[in-house]
Amino acid sequence: MFLFSRKTRTPISTYSDSYRAPTSIKEVYKDPPLCAWEANKFLTPGLTHTMERHVDPEALQKMAKCAVQDYTYRGSISGHPYLPEKYWLSQEEADKCSPNYLGSDWYNTWRMEPYNSSCCNKYTTYLPRLPKEARMETAVRGMPLECPPRPERLNAYEREVMVNMLNSLSRNQQLPRITPRCGCVDPLPGRLPFHGYESACSGRHYCLRGMDYYASGAPCTDRRLRPWCREQPTMCTSLRAPARNAVCCYNSPAVILPISEP
């Protein structure tokens, strides 16, 4: 193991068997060599003076002669790859020989890009596509909505709205009477009695099964119509009173309980 001194840089051994006499290291200063000229390493190579090369005039003439012969030979061959205009086709030849179309269908192409080929296009029309910003809202507006089929009979709310509309119209002109079809006066086989009531506003009798009123004023003729009954049906019970005001109130019977007599 050697320990070096910073001053003398002399290795000092810690072992007695490896001891040697200390010697100092001296650095001798030498003057740079005197040179009249040295190459500038930072000079751009392109700016240096080029040496004149010897050019053989016979070899230069031979190269020019070979170039002329090669150009003449290439121009004499029809359809040579160096003349690509030989392969250019007119529009008529392209229409006849182009493999991009099948038969006479201009839209039946081999292009398999999305929405570019009619053979794999989910849109069956050839009209131009809508702009991207208006495509979604236009598609949503024109999309058919799956609505349930409209029932033949109106529900309680629709019946009440229709009654109020008829009452508002009856103030200006006389409307035909609504023929009631209650279960008590029109007992059809397989049907339970329904609740019919008289409106205090219009003074008419309404049946909750359905209204036999038409815009033309003539009731349906194929139905079995019964005369207007002025009493409340005895076989039905309502848990809530009928509508009090046809204009402001949309009350309808909440629960209808058919009562069977023993």
Swiss-Prot record:
GO terms for biological process: cell differentiation; flagellated sperm motility; protein-containing complex assembly; spermatogenesis. Expressed in testis. Strongly expressed in ciliated epithelial cells with lower levels in goblet cells (at protein level). It is found in: Cytoplasm, Cytoskeleton; Nucleus; Cytoplasm; Mitochondrion. Coiled coil: none annotated. Induction: Down-regulated by IL13. The keyword Aminoacyl-tRNA synthetase does not apply. The keyword DNA repair does not apply. It comes from the Eukaryota. Pfam families: SMRP1. InterPro entries: SPMIP6 (IPR028195). One of its GO terms (cellular component) is cytosol. One of its GO terms (molecular function) is alpha-tubulin binding. Keywords: Cell projection, Cilium, Cytoplasm, Cytoskeleton, Differentiation, Flagellum, Mitochondrion, Nucleus, Spermatogenesis. May participate in intramanchette transport and midpiece formation of the sperm tail. May play a potential role in somatic cell proliferation. Belongs to the SPMIP6 family. Microtubule inner protein component of sperm flagellar doublet microtubules. Interacts with alpha-tubulin. This is Sperm microtubule inner protein 6. It comes from Homo sapiens (Human). The lineage of its organism: Eukaryota, Metazoa, Chordata, Craniata, Vertebrata. The gene is SPMIP6.
